[in-house]
Swiss-Prot record:
Belongs to the aspartate/ornithine carbamoyltransferase superfamily. OTCase family. L-ornithine binds at residues 168, 232, 236-237. It comes from Rhizobium meliloti (strain 1021). The lineage of its organism: Bacteria, Pseudomonadati, Pseudomonadota, Alphaproteobacteria, Hyphomicrobiales. GO terms for cellular component: cytoplasm. It comes from the Bacteria. Keywords: Arginine metabolism, Cytoplasm, Plasmid, Transferase. It is found in: Cytoplasm. The keyword Cytoplasm applies. Carbamoyl phosphate binds at residues 57-60, 84, 108, 135-138, 274-275, 320. This is Ornithine carbamoyltransferase, catabolic.
């Protein structure tokens, strides 16, 4: 391999250099082509992978399980009820047990400190499948997807993230674009901007890569000339209704709708979303939002945009599997 990523963990977006990150994207594209052509070779035969999910997931779990299956690895899935981590057993002790049984561990949960503790004590690679602070595996897929849907070099791609920018997706899209030298626009209400900690990381990376960075509360300014518009959900299950009401009122001007897509001035602008998306009333939460707040045509994105040709969120979701496979092969492969 061109780069030696063997036995490396992935805990934050900035853990890898731009060249290492680009290598993972290139490897993912090669593995994707091989899967489509049915010429894929197994590089993880006999490996044991543990997936710890304190937060449930569709895409992350399926991406890891299919990637492992394709590459010959075995998987143990620990759901929120199937692990004692943080309840009866500390992250440190869990790491020291699982590290003796598995070749790698994936963790998806709230705690960034938790996943970092796993990596410190497990003695095997640990992958952050999502925490409250970062979503690094999603970023490899997002960069791959933008590259596939643009004829520009990665460093010339322009994208905006619109919405709650202090979220794990807000942090991650802020940082990955600055890492890779891209044109990054982060847009949301000032009260929901990334903290100084994340802005400082982004600015340091920007100085190294030559990235262009805008943080603004003006959606039309943010999307001008962009190739891609990203967003994510505004609310989460388990939050108090008062929080939902306040946040929805605050973020309604930041909904991705046909008008905002057109404001880019680029008819080829694509829409991206890590999913799930609240774009209609066909889910329990979607119907609840419609009933309580009168937003029957979607929350963070309208159904019109979501069902349009501009939406590439499903290609983005597929690429989760190819990029996670690349990460596994690069860090564990023979």
């Amino acid at each position: 391999m061109s780069f030696n990523l063997r036995n490396r963990s992935l805990l934050t977006v900035q853990d890898y250099t731009p060249r290492e990150f680009r290598y993972l994207v290139d490897l993912a594209r090669d593995l994707k082509r091989a899967k489509y052509a049915r010429t894929e070779q197994e590089h993880l035969k006999g490996k044991e992978i543990c997936l710890i999910f304190e937060k449930t997931s569709t895409r992350t779990r399926c991406a890891f399980e299919v990637a492992c299956s394709d590459q010959g690895a075995n998987v143990t899935y620990l759901d929120p009820a199937g692990s004692q981590i943080g309840h009866k057993e500390s992250f440190k002790d869990t790491a020291r047990v699982l590290g003796r049984m598995y070749d790698a561990i994936e963790y998806r949960g709230a705690s960034q400190a938790g996943v970092e503790t796993l990596a410190k004590y497990a003695g095997v690679p640990v992958y952050n499948g999502l925490t409250d602070e970062y979503h690094p595996t999603q970023m490899i897929a997002d960069v791959m997807t933008m590259r596939e849907h643009s004829d520009k070099p990665i460093s010339e791609i322009k994208y905006a993230y619109i919405g709650d920018t202090r979220s794990n997706m807000g942090h991650s899209l802020l940082i990955v674009g600055c890492l890779m030298g891209m044109d990054v626009r982060i847009c949301g209400p000032r009260s929901l901007w990334p903290s100084e900690e994340y802005q400082t990381i982004a600015k340091r990376l920007k100085a190294q890569s030559g990235a262009r960075l805008m943080i603004t509360d003006n959606p039309r300014e943010a999307v001008e000339g962009v190739d891609f518009i990203h967003t994510d959900v505004w609310v989460s299950m388990g939050e108090p209704k008062e929080v939902w009401k306040e946040r929805i009122q605050l973020l309604t001007p930041y909904q991705v709708n046909a008008e905002l897509m057109a404001a880019s001035g680029n008819p080829q602008t694509k829409f991206m979303h890590c999913l799930p998306a609240y774009h209609d009333t066909e889910t329990t939460i979607g119907k609840q939002i419609s009933d309580d707040y009168g937003m029957s045509d979607g929350l963070e994105v309208t159904d019109e945009v979501f069902e349009s040709q501009a939406n590439i969120a499903f290609e983005q979701a597929e690429n989760r599997m190819h990029t996670i496979k690349a990460l596994l092969v690069a860090t564990l492969g023979d």
